[in-house]
Curated annotation (Swiss-Prot):
Keywords: ATP-binding, Glutamine amidotransferase, GMP biosynthesis, Ligase, Nucleotide-binding, Purine biosynthesis. It comes from Wolbachia pipientis subsp. Culex pipiens (strain wPip). This is GMP synthase [glutamine-hydrolyzing]. One of its GO terms (molecular function) is ATP binding. The active site is at residues 84, 175, 177. It catalyses: XMP + L-glutamine + ATP + H2O = GMP + L-glutamate + AMP + diphosphate + 2 H(+).
Amino acid sequence: MSAIAVIDFGSQFTQLIARQIREMGVYCEIFPSNIDFETVSKFNGFIFSGGPQSVNDNCSEVSEVAHKIIKLNETINTPILGICYGQQLICHYFGAKVRKEFNQEFGKTKIKILKESPIIKDTWDVNSEVDVLMNHADSVETIPQGFTAIASGIINQTIAIIANEQRKIYCTQFHPEVKPTTNGSKLLSNFLDIANCERDWTMKSFIEKQKEKIQNLVGEKKVIAAVSGGVDSSVAAVLTHKAIGKQLNCIFIDTGLLRKSQTTAMLKEIPINYVDKSNLFLSRLKGITDPEEKRKIIGNTFIEVFEEEAKKIGDVDFLMQGTIYSDVVESGHASGNTSTIKSHHNVGGLPEKMNLKLVEPLRYLFKDEVRLLGKEIGLSDEIIFQHPFPGPGLAVRIICEVDEEKVRILQEVDEIYINTMKNYDLYDKIWQAFAVLLPVKTVGVMGDNRTYGYVCALRAVTSSDGMTADAFPFENKDQHSLVFWRFLQDISSIIVNKVSRVNRVVYDLTSKPPATIEWE
């Protein structure tokens, strides 16, 4: 099977490269810039991502693998594509001068195509002007020996595309993977053709490969699975069960932080043990308000409970989790140069001294790919298309100390919000919707009486992979917008009338970035 390795130097767009290449039918994997060369040496081609560094700084640590890949290209002609910082790194390697750009370029700009090349075949014509996204502080000042200019910036004469056709090395100063770049995905597709990649990666092939990986990793050992009833853990559990059958022991832990009607009953083909540890989780969260501390406490307690259950089963060596790629990215584990946005209870929140080894079959899949996988293995739409629910549960939707009363209030609000949304035929139009209980109370009037109750915030976003998101319905100006505004008016009235401790409802309009989807 053909495969492309993306060496991640910390760009915010790296995941978009991988997603687009996978959508073209070629398997693509992202590796940190300090990855061991032997791990990536057998790939059909390499892409060096953008990043915040400057090649004029000491970049020997982050560029060691890049230098070895360029040496590999010298030997066996493995194609390389450098994007933004990746272009600067390659040019610096070949002795070109990279300067600090006085007119730094951030945002949409135009380039002019100077010459034909396989990298822009059927993409842009010579002499045409093309919209692209630039995002750089440094620029390549001189073209390295053996390379040819394919395109240049119209405003700043930036060296926008260069190519060494003989060695199959291509560089762009702009980001072809981002939408403001016109037809940028075609450039990526051309690179796959240059690398002689077969378009044979599908969910079916992924399933077979993952089953084989799980079997080789686990052997004859037993595995316990963290099943929450959500799409990620459900898909991961069914896939693992298909790989090792009865060696998998699925456990549902009631943390006391779940939705009111959350259940795993839909997974008919897998036996599930129910464990109620709600009192334990709530007691450990007493007095805790910091969101990172909440996540780590929940992560530690979660694993502790699983270790206890593993002892009851006996001879268990592995813990399966439904970790997906957005969890890894936001926890800062995808690249040595990426900062931590938040710890996820099934990634950064794990105790360092775990007594169980991890099985994470979905670790490098995006949410939309997880849903495609769920379809392929026969899960119902009810499971596959349910909205994401965070591993720490309602603890990160209660923006203050967590206790049983606040959980009950938020469960009631959440149930009303989601069920009413379904009645309005809006649920399937929205990527994720949920309610948040705020740490403030406000004055209200009901009947002739003064009230002093909690404020709850409602959130609804559209997204494709969870990496970016827009507040619904502002991304799409259609008939759903009018329906949604009527829905918000109705739902606020229903909530304050049915949930006695809440007297005010607000709606969160913030996109991601700058915010995250969840509040904590």
